[in-house]
Amino acid sequence: MADPDAIYELAQRIESNIEVDKRVAALHSLQSLLESAGHVVEADAVTSAVKVALRHANQALSTASLSFIPTYASMIYSGDATDSHSLLNHNVRMLVNSVGLLVIDKLGDQKERIREAARTALIELGNAAYAISSGHLTTSGKGKETETPLGIFERTLREAGLAAKFARVREQSVLLLPILRQSCEKYPIRPLLSTTVELLLDADATVREGARSTLITLFSSATPAAKADLKKELEKRAVRKQTADAILREVLGAPSAATSAPVLSPPAPTTFAPTTRSQFNSSHGADASIPTSYMKSAPAAGTTFPSMPSASATAAADGIRPVYIASRSDLERTFTTMMPFFENKESEHNWLNREQSMIKIRGLLVSGAHRQFGETLFVAQLKAVQEGILKCISSLRTTLSMHAIHLVQELAMELGDDLAPCVEAFLIHLVGMAGFTKKLIANATQEAAAAIMVNVSFRPLYLQLIWQAFQEKNVATRTAAAEHLCTVLNTHAAHRKHAVESHGGLDLLEKCMRKGVGDSNPAARTKSREAFWIFHRHWAAQANALLNSLDPAIRKQVAALAPSDVETDTIVEQQPKADGGPVRVRPGGASMALIQAKKAAALKAAQERDRKKAEDAAAAHEARVAAARAALAEQQQQQQQVQKHLEQQASVEDFVTPVAANNKKGTGFMPIKNRSLHHPGGQGAGAANLKPATELTVVISPTAHQRIQTAISVPLPTSPTPAVTPNARIKSKNLSQTSWETPPHPRSPGLSPVSARSRAISSSSYSSQGSSSSARMQGAASTPRSNRAPPVTHSTLKADLENLSIDGIDGIDDGEVTADATQQARFATSSRDNGTGEDDTLQMNAPEDASMDLMGMDFNSPFKMPASGGRAVKTQSVLLERQNALDALQQTPQPKSHRTISTSSTSSTNSSTTPASASVRRSGLPRPVSTMHSPSPSASASHISAGHIHAPTTSHRVLSSTPSRRAPTNGVSTALENRAKRLDAQASTASASPAKAKPEVWTWIQALMDGTADLRTFRRLARLSSEFGISATKAADERTEQDDEMVLERGPFSNVAWATKSDGAFSSGLQAWLEGGLFGKLFDGLKRYLCVGDGGGSGELQMSAQVVLLRLVENQFSLFGATDREGELLDVVLQSITLLCGTRTSCVASSSIVAGRAALQGFESILGAWSGRCDPVLGFDALLSRSLSDASTVAVLRSGFTPLLVRLPAQLVLEDFLPRLAPLLTSTLHHASPEKRLTAVTVLRHLNDMVRIDAQDSHTRIFDALGLTIRDDDDQAELKSKRALLDVLMYYFSKN
């Protein structure tokens, strides 16, 4: 029994100011008394003395007090039997409050001895606090809770130890937790978990390592709930992944308090054959035994499989880290967090989360979560995300798809039959991707499908999917089906034979075999034959019957692949020959009579077949002749009816398209669809009765021109010496070609395509007429033109009809016109008197010329031209066109300027004295008429000198270089002759009126005015614009060649609309369109459909109206200036663009947005066409003067200003136009919309590309014009903005 007074006295001595040694001695004496007593007496006095000694600066006294605390703390909570619990609780609380902080501070001491004493003291303090608080965590007094000693100790340790300022104190405090847990098995760690996890992120490495080791030690043997809390806390605090994975690997990999079965990591695979689940179970230490049936399913000899790695191998190859699960709820939470990522379609925002989800599920398999919590729970959670896995398999991102495919493969290997709820969806999806474009994905999917078939028990679905794959057209799918068939038979045929035979399995197998062994692909065929012999090993009878039912060739190939232990001779049955009955064979063989009888029967049968063929051919020929005669009669009847109709309407002037005319400058022929010639000089004086241009069109291909230019560069040894100057060039034009039109590309005088065609016709006509045609030709060479009789056109038409193909006459489409060169009017077959004594015959050089040989022309047959789109030749139109042309040439005299220019170059010395026999050359073709009637050089020279006093124009040079076919008329006055030429040219070049050529155009315009126009109306108007176009090139030629007064029409922007005024009449194409206000009414009608919003019609009609307006701008642009409608056109386009841009920014339906974009693109095209044709200076001023809305800036800059600026000179743009446009460009560059900024940058980039060719430092000058030059007085914000903008512009300038 301890003396309380003695204890109290010793405590007082310790607190007094006596010497340190005496205080230390008193402390030791106090410790001896308490140990001898076995319990604490006067606890308040002792606690106060310990606190004073511990705070003393003397190290000996403080160290002695630290050594005293463990003894005192171990005795303070036990007390005497008479002490109440409340008294003991008070004593412990007081001790912890008094010395707790002081002892924790000693943990940071430099001496290990002191730190060790402090750790011992803290452990005893913690034990005392836990012991006294284990039964009563809280006590209530007057409704108020009091903090327990354990709570005080935990708070002190957390705030002063784990959260201390010194790293050593934090390290020692966290290392103290495992000791506390070891001394007290149920010591609560949860209150300190958050602070301990935070120490994993501490800046000091020793603290981080101490926290890691503490967590591993504390939670290795903790309950699953505690481990789940640790995992959540690690994720919540965003601990470094490597650190967290290492801790979880140690914690979750160790057995918990609720689990005793060890979890081992899977070993690496040791085989390359398809791995079954039994091998994985054994490798993971599972208790399940290996089924013997799986072991019997080893591959047969000679059968190979693709390499199928194990689940752990594929995961290790992809760098998959284990994902540990602490509890069932943690597993459910893991799968639940993935589900939102698989909703909707794959996008840039969710594909990465999907890939991480696939990796996480693979990590679960690596960590063995499916074995830890049971396959049933794991598969149930997997079923919830199965649809997302299928989406990932079908992804176009290769990494995501490969992760998903490997996941399914590993699931099949790890789960086996437990994967049954998910097998059907997985297998159907994987087999269906065998024909995927990416071979890597296709091969991986088939490996995964094979893994399912190997590791999951047999089900009829396997054979059904394989049979469906065999029926696919894709080769890869059929090859994969054959491989799967081998896999299924190798794996399941032995131990699942009854399952295979049920549900029609044998029938499906036979179908697959029969289909596969005869497959066209070698790989699928070979694999199917291997599968057949596996099938034969288990179902020999069915396999033998199947083999004998195959074709002999296939049966032989299948038998060649038989294994060595199979006797194919006993399997394959010898098929008897299918004869009608038994044949009795003579001993000496067949008799001679029998052989002769067989030969005679065979000969008779052959003759009978030939006779039938001849009869059929004759009947077909008669049918064709009858059809040709009927067609000829019908054509003649229609011709008479049309002729009568034309005679009744002789007062109406039709637009004429000559047969061999075109406004194209080229040297070849090509068919044209629905287009007509519309040059100003396209109508002769006698061509009023010809049919419209839509009946026949022949244009000249520029490609052929290049070929002929190459051909004429070859020397022509057989050609005669030309009588004209070497620089003379002629062009291929129609019979009514004006004398002042000159092609931009000169052509060789000997290679006119018109003459080539006429020459081919002439040769065929001469060959068919025989000597009569030769006599006629001789007469033509010696008789003056005025004395010749007019030709008989009826015989010509019949001769032409005989050479025409009548196939497909009934299938002719009026909308598709294709010309045949042999069906043109044959002016060379007979002579015609046109009233002026000039020869209109067109001829071409002989085919022995080198140029014709290079072109590959065949003059022995009619010169056909390919039909466009496979259409038949329009025979009726050609006949009527030729008849009208002949009648017109007979009735109307042709002026000199309209004669057809000869294409033959002949020596002048021989031309006038050519004998009659020379009309036929060595090739059998007639000599060109020009060689028989060419004048002498003196005559030609006199004609040139007399006809032109001043410098001749281009057309005059062409005429002067062309040899005339009659003697010059020296008695005619030169002035009078020139005046007659101009009058004839004006009469022949009067442009055809669209209103007269197409009288129904007024009906179309009225439909526009009434709002009843349909798509056909707009299509016809667009075609009308193309047919009667006004070429800017022709306008320039007319302006150059015409000597009369030039009149400029109104037009503020273009300044190119003009007409030629002569005697009060306009001969240009402008006047033809202005007749009756045609163009103005057409434009007014179009505006009704161009309106954006209400009144504009449907979107389809509005787009059709845009097309017509675009064609008007392209083909009749000068009319807008002539009618003062150019400003109105610009206003309509700009207003429509403004309205459409404003509508696009508002909230409208998606269909309206698409329609609005299409309409906006149409108006931008019209604006771009206007910008490319108007005068750039005037057009820029007009466009800049319009008030532009903010929404339409992009469209106007892109389609309006850019085409105008790039057409201007560089210096003018930099000095004048770009500074005027600078405010608009600068505001657009600073706009918030990226589209507008990019548009402005694009405009400046185009300008820089144009300007830097002619100007140095183009970008500097552009920046100066825009006001972007950096000045000294710029403030900081403005300087920063300018620099950023200059950097962007320089970047785009330097890209090109």
UniProtKB/Swiss-Prot annotation:
Cell cycle among keywords = yes
Keyword list, A-Z: Cell cycle, Cell division, Coiled coil, Cytoplasm, Cytoskeleton, Microtubule, Mitosis, Nucleus
Q: Where in the cell is it found?
A: Cytoplasm, Cytoskeleton; Nucleus; Cytoplasm, Cytoskeleton, Spindle
The GO cellular component terms are: cytoplasmic microtubule; microtubule organizing center; mitotic spindle; mitotic spindle midzone; nucleus; spindle microtubule
Chief location of this protein within or outside the cell? cytoplasm
Bias (Polar residues) ranges = 277-287, 953-964
| Pfam families cross-referenced by the UniProt entry | CLASP_N
Q: Where are the transmembrane segments?
A: none
Compositionally biased region (Low complexity) = 755-782, 900-919, 933-946
The UniProt similarity line reads: Belongs to the CLASP family.
What this protein is reported to do is described as: Microtubule binding protein that promotes the stabilization of dynamic microtubules. Required for mitotic spindle formation.
Complex and partners:
Interacts with microtubules.
Specify the protein name: Protein STU1
Q: Which organism is it from?
A: Mycosarcoma maydis
